[in-house]
């Protein structure tokens, strides 16, 4: 946890308790529920080579005299995927931005990895609420040596509702500001994944 009020647990079933239809519905994002922070934490594990990190909100608390009272430190909870699987996922996520549905998150000259998301909202009485969606885009940059990860999630956007249409452009615009502020220069690859040919 992150020690904030209102923090929720996600819904992710134990494979031992699942049936074949559960696997099929989970493959398209149904039957799973995570908070934005939980989703970003999972994406960071892909970005960093497989380590699930303990998130923290406060980087450092410093007293007036300069004494460090508390400091957030990198804490690895466990390895959740191998480096090889993480690399394969990074490559696929980079193609989402360079070739797939996440092109609206692309910034010329930068290697960005990402994933679009469009989820139906649950109705109060069960089932799904007609015309109500959560649109998201999550990603990190640079795709080959990640430094920054971000999630943009819109609850019930009006008009267009796909993550690629509404969330990815916000991700791109925000990321451009971060890259500029941090002085991160474009890669020589002009934003395209390196070819293995």
Locate the predicted segments by residue.
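Gram-negative outer-membrane assembly/targeting C-terminal domains
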Residues: 177-197
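Short amphipathic alpha-helical signal-transduction/dimerization elements
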Residues: 47, 97, 172-179, 183
């Amino acid at each position: 946890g992150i020690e904030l009020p209102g923090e929720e647990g996600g819904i992710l079933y134990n494979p031992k308790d699942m049936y074949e239809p559960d696997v099929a519905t989970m493959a398209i994002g149904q039957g799973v529920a995570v908070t934005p922070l939980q989703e970003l934490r999972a994406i960071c594990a892909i970005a960093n080579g497989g380590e699930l990190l303990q998130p923290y909100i406060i980087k450092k608390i410093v007293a007036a005299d300069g004494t460090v009272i508390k400091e957030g430190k990198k804490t690895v909870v466990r390895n959740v995927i191998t480096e090889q699987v993480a690399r394969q996922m990074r490559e696929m996520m980079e193609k989402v931005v360079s070739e797939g549905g996440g092109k609206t998150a692309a910034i010329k000259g930068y290697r960005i990895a990402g994933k679009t998301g469009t989820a139906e909202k649950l109705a109060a009485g069960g089932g799904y609420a007609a015309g109500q969606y959560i649109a998201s885009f999550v990603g990190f940059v640079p795709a080959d040596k990640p430094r920054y990860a971000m999630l943009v999630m819109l609850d019930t956007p009006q008009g267009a509702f796909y993550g690629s249409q509404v969330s990815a452009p916000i991700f791109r615009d925000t990321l451009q500001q971060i890259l500029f502020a941090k002085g991160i220069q474009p890669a020589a690859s002009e934003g395209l994944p390196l070819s293995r040919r």
